[in-house]
Design a protein with these regions (language model features):
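Generic hydrophobic, amphipathic alpha-helix propensity
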Residues: 10-19, 35, 60-64, 68, ...
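Helix-turn-helix
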Residues: 13, 17-59
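Helix-loop "lid/cap" segments that line or gate small-molecule binding pockets
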Residues: 97-104, 111-122, 200
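Hydrophobic/aromatic-rich alpha-helical bundle segments in the mid-to-C-terminal region
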Residues: 127-131, 148-212
């Protein structure tokens, strides 16, 4: 009898091969043939699921984004109601850590996601996913900032612009930490990432608290 292949699982195996190639050789090397070799498949097997390299890269970008967003949404669902609760603070740091290359799985995803976002500047077929995923991640960061900084004064007239600025500041910090950790892992260790992130969050709270 012919072997039954789980199509969803096979696609994820192929996406995994794409991410490994991006991490070791760069996105430009992620052709159908290179990905097939990395996945231990015939090129025809990859073509069964993806018509072209562009099709493969677009699918992989969405898959990586969705993995990140799934982890983020799962983590945000576990946040407690009190911004000053130590458990909530720890949960926030855990949630934001999903953006960062703190272990092998997250390092592969972070490397691929940043590479795809950069490539979207000059590859139009990636632009829609770059916009979608950025907006989705920004929405999660916005929820975190609102939870951390806005609960004490939910009706503050000037809170909106301040929260937007804080959210953009946090997004930029996360991008910078991820890039630094990927480029200089011997210096920006997982422990250093966590320490910098915790310091940043505490600094945001102090600045917002001082403004009230």
């Amino acid at each position: 009898m012919p072997k039954i292949v789980d199509a969803a699982q096979r696609r994820q195996e192929i996406v995994g091969a794409v991410c490994r190639i991006i991490a070791t050789d760069g996105l430009e090397r992620a052709s159908l043939r290179e990905v097939a070799d990395e996945a231990g498949l015939a090129v025809g097997s990859v073509r069964h699921y993806f018509d072209s390299s562009d099709d493969l890269l677009a699918y992989s970008f969405t898959a990586v984004s969705d993995r990140l967003l799934t982890r983020l949404n799962k983590a945000i669902a576990g946040l407690g109601p009190g911004a000053d609760d130590p458990d909530t603070s720890r949960a926030v740091l855990t949630l934001l850590g999903e953006f960062l290359p703190l272990d092998e799985e997250r390092a592969l995803d972070a490397c691929a996601w940043l590479a795809f976002r950069n490539a979207a500047r000059i590859r139009p077929f990636l632009a829609a996913e770059a916009d979608r995923s950025h907006r989705a991640v920004a929405a999660v960061v916005g929820q975190v900032i609102t939870r951390l900084l806005h609960e004490d004064d939910p009706a503050g007239a000037d809170a909106g612009p301040q929260l937007v600025t804080a959210a953009e500041h946090l997004l930029a910090t996360l991008d910078g930490l991820a890039m630094h950790a990927l480029l200089q892992p011997g210096w920006m260790s997982p422990e250093m990432c966590r320490d910098v992130l915790e310091s940043h969050i505490e600094g945001l709270r102090r600045r917002v608290g001082a403004s009230h």
